[in-house]
Regions:
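HhH-family (HhH-GPD) DNA N-glycosylase catalytic core used in base-excision repair
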Residues: 1-319
């Protein structure tokens, strides 16, 4: 249940909208929303001891959302500023996994998964409802280290993002509009460390961004939404999965092609590394819930030994 409270408008001290969300079960906010941020210095997402700050480019305009730590009774207070404040607080229940139903997931036969589910009962898949805000950083993350991608994303947001409305932490930004993204010149993609292949993929998405978002909204199934994404040059299976896991809380899409994921899943489930095909075979018994199983593995605390060559951090600004 969500209670929408009146709030004063036009003040940086007082929110433009606020809500109290009372979930049916206690939600682990960091575990649920942790996948959304792109590194510790993401200009759109910042954590502190009291909760999380998140900026949005909503259909009504920019917004800053503050989600506070749950109260003693499990209720979660959220406040928002900016033209998109009402949209942002309305999105809180879905963002915190209200529609993510784990009741059909049976992991009782695997000790690691069973233990992780027991220790993380408040883990849910977050649904942002903002396709482009998940798709563009996923493209930037293609075939490079996380460090490179996070650095590029932060640079582009600092240069072209809009200052966050309200009392957000210094340096927070709202992602550019579609038109502003389209207007970024090739040399600034380059200066941000995004090589020409990824920059072309981003521009290809931006050409059809409006129709792509509409197609994803109207898709009868999440599989159809993934198919729509993969029609764009430069958007493959990995990128579609990384996007829909965040924008639509896709419970089954697995990031096939990830540099480490298959090895990690294999070692966690059977004690040895596997390739992508092996990972999909291991996850097959949980079809329909495979992303949930991956999230349980990630939340389990399992550590695997990274062997072999590491990806080299490259500075594409000088290529």
């Amino acid at each position: 249940m969500t209670a929408v409270l009146p709030a004063a408008s036009g003040s940086h001290a007082l929110p433009d909208a606020e809500t109290v969300y009372r979930p049916a079960v206690a939600i682990d906010v960091p575990a649920t929303l942790g996948l959304l941020g792109r590194g510790p210095y993401d200009p759109t997402t910042q954590w502190d001891l009291g909760g999380v700050w998140r900026t949005w480019r909503t259909p009504q305009g920019p917004a800053t959302l503050r989600i506070h730590r749950p109260a003693w009774d499990g209720s979660i207070h959220a406040t928002a500023w900016g033209p998109g404040a009402a949209w942002a607080v309305d999105a809180v229940p879905a963002l915190l996994g209200r529609d993510d139903d784990w009741s059909g997931l049976d992991v009782s036969g695997h000790p690691l998964l069973r233990g992780s589910l027991h220790r993380n009962p408040g883990l849910r898949l977050a649904r942002t409802g903002r396709l482009l805000e998940a798709l563009l950083p996923a493209i930037i993350e293609q075939r490079v280290t996380s460090l490179e991608a996070y650095r590029s994303w932060a640079r582009l947001l600092r240069w072209y993002g809009e200052p966050a409305p309200g009392p957000a932490p210094e340096g927070m930004r709202v992602v550019p509009t579609i038109e502003q993204w389209r207007g970024i010149p090739s040399w600034d993609w380059h200066r941000a460390g995004v090589d020409p292949r990824r920059a072309r993929a981003a521009q290809a998405v931006l050409v059809v961004a409006t129709s792509l978002e509409r197609a994803a909204e109207r898709a009868e199934t999440l599989a159809a939404a993934a198919d729509a994404l993969r029609t764009v040059p430069g958007v493959g299976q990995w990128t579609a999965a990384e996007t829909l896991q965040r924008s639509h809380a896709h419970p089954d899409l697995v990031s096939v092609g990830d540099y480490h994921l298959a090895h990690y899943v294999g070692e966690a489930l059977i004690g040895r590394r596997v390739d992508d095909d092996g990972m999909l075979e291991l996850l097959e018994p949980w079809t329909g819930h495979r992303q949930r199983v991956v999230r349980l593995i990630l939340a389990s605390g399992f550590r695997f030994e990274r062997r072999g060559p590491r990806m080299t951090v490259q500075d594409h600004r000088w290529h």
